[in-house]
Amino acid sequence: YGFETSEGFISDVTDKILPQIEDWQNRPLDEVYPILYIDAIHYSVRDNGVIRKLAAYVILGINTEGKKEVLSITVGDNESSKYWLSVLNELKNRGVKDILIICADGLSGIKEAIAAAFPKTEYPRCIVHQVRNTLKYVPDKDRKAFASDLKTIYHASDEEKARLALDRVTEKWTAKYPNSMKRWYDNWDAITPIFKFSPDVGKVIYTTNAIESLNSTYR
């Protein structure tokens, strides 16, 4: 950024803000959160002269008043069910008793941790990631039409209609893109929880804009 600073200055600033960060990270939370989003931001960090990748895991909650609240930011490099169980248990220690829905995707071990810490919580597959993975290898000329057809699946009013839409989309595109819909069938049990809710609630669940826009400000 065009300027330099000393290690001593950085240490002084760190010493002053660390207690505030710890107070924030340990503050009491609400008892109930309808929805939690969990996502990772990856950074390059210098550690003893070596550059390595670390992930900051951001937990964004939607409270019972519909307001967004960052509950926690933790840094780690070892995703596992044990790690996520400790993160979720820390939320419980801060007062959280119930979470209706947790939206997270691609985080190793989190499904098992949710089942252990909050066994009644729904954990649907992230639809946005599902769609992105499907369209990843689809050329531009077909992407818009394919994406529009995929919407008929997750915009369906119930699971039965969604499954019919899935079969129709697969029949339409499988000759041209043979493996494009395989993950939808493989992940179907993890996708279907969104159909337990109204379309308006379902849209909130499968839209990750809330946490993605937040994480973009951290970058």
What is the meaning of each model-derived region?
Residues P119-K136:
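Inter-helix linker motif
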Residues P139-D140, S198:
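Generic structural signal for alpha-helix starts
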Residues G8, I101, H129, N179-K182:
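Short, solvent-exposed positions on alpha-helices
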Residues F3-E7, D12, K16-C103, S108, ...:
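RNase H-like nuclease fold core
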